[in-house]
Each structure stands twice: as C-alpha cells, then as structure tokens.
Amino acid sequence: MVESLPDVTFQIAAVTEMSPRLLSMMRYSNVVLHPNASHKQLDKLYQESDLYLDINHHNELYKATRTAFEHQLLILAFSETAHGRDYTAPEHIYASQNYPAMVAKIKQVLGNDQAMQEAMQAQKAQANTLTASELADRLQSLLGGNHV
C-alpha cells in the first residue's frame, strides 16, 4: 500500500519497540514510525490524520478504533484484522489480498471532499450516531412540540 500511495504519509505508531520488519518500513519516504509512542503522541496523530487504517495483526490497544471514530477519522480495515466493526462501515472492510480496493478508496476519498463526506456518513450510520441537530429533530418528532 505504501508504494501504491506515494503522496500519502503513513504514520505508524506503537506503544512498544517495533519489530525489525516494521522498522524496515523506514526505507519509504512516505512512512514515519513512532515506536514507544506516548498517549500524548498518539492523540496528536489522531488530531492530524484524515484516515485510520485498522490493519494491525495484533491486539488493539487503547480502543484505537473507537478513538479514531471519535476524532472523525475515516476508518478502513482488513477483514482479517478489523478490531472495531461497530465503527467501521461494512463497505470499508476489505480482504487483505484485495488491498488494491482499499488503495482505490483512499485515493477516492482523499481526492474528493464529497466522496469523503459520503464515506463518513456510511461510517456514522454503522455506528448509529446522530448529529446534535438530528437528535433534536428526532426528539421533537417523538415528543411533539418544541421541547428541545
């Protein structure tokens, strides 16, 4: 994926030391590694990112997928590694051998605001979330009158 998306910076963080295999990713100019990342560093990465790739083959740490959702990052995952299916739209989950489809989705949403908005809407629908105004509208229709 890194080679297929040379204009995308991949920020890869771990709260521990990184394996030699992961460290070898430093050879790519669009990869930045963050071994032994602190909570503060992780929070900064969430704030600065547009996407969260749920492709870690090990256990999820610190509710990473939920945190990505709360930071309004588009979440894309591999079916074999998806940790946060409650927050990931089914159409954003790909078989790992079908990574070119994920690459195509990344290119689509990063190059088109409307595509990103539609993808985020699908993600919000999966998580059954509402905006404040949507909640107010629903409460008003349930309660009748102007209670909100």
Which stretches of residues belong to each language-model region?
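Conserved acidic donor-binding segment of nucleotide-sugar-dependent glycosyltransferases
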Residues: 91-100, 108-113
